[in-house]
Amino acid sequence: FKDDQAEDYKKALATLNAVLVNLYKSGKQPQLNILTDRLQLKEMHNCGAGDSNITLAPNGKFYLCPAFYYDEKMGISNRLKHHKLSSERCVGDLEAGLQIPNPQLLKLDHAPLCRICDAYHCNRCIWLNQKLTWDNNTPSHQQCVLAHLERNAARDLQQQLKAAGFSAGEEIKQIDYLDPFDVREQF
């Protein structure tokens, strides 16, 4: 995803919103996770990889998520050449148990940008984080922009549904940024 694609994605989300509103008006209550989930969420909702979920792979090893296993299995763990190639992406095995170094660093409360963000439907993908920022707990610009485009589209949907007489959850406030890093305060 590149910044110049943001407008196209925004238009696609607006088109989906129009379809959703028309379906609501016809008596249906469709769900489209990237737009409707945010209407009901009150906190961050992602996969919880490495924190509340762990992957046990066919090789008997534990991984923070399946993507790390497939990185190792396919030998692509260093595609972006950020650091020395390592085929060991596991965080333990059935014999030795789970051994996540610094597990607190995978938690939301240790992610300065994410813990104050309200793009609750963000993927916050630790595999992508590691690939693009070298840090499991810091999302890339691309992830933040996508999440905020979807968040803002969910806000637009919420306003359209309310205008049509439907209940649409707690108000999603208007913001004027797509990447929280651009408006961050010192941590």
Question: Where are these predicted regions, by residue range?
Answer:
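Radical SAM/AdoMet-radical enzyme domain recognition
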Residues: 1-3
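C-terminal accessory region of radical SAM enzymes
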Residues: 8-39, 67-124, 132
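Short catalytic-site patches enriched in acidic/histidine residues
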Residues: 38-46
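Conserved acidic functional residues
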Residues: 53, 66
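Short, acidic, Ser/Thr-enriched surface-loop or helix-capping motifs
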Residues: 56-57
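Radical SAM enzyme core and accessory elements
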Residues: 73, 107-187
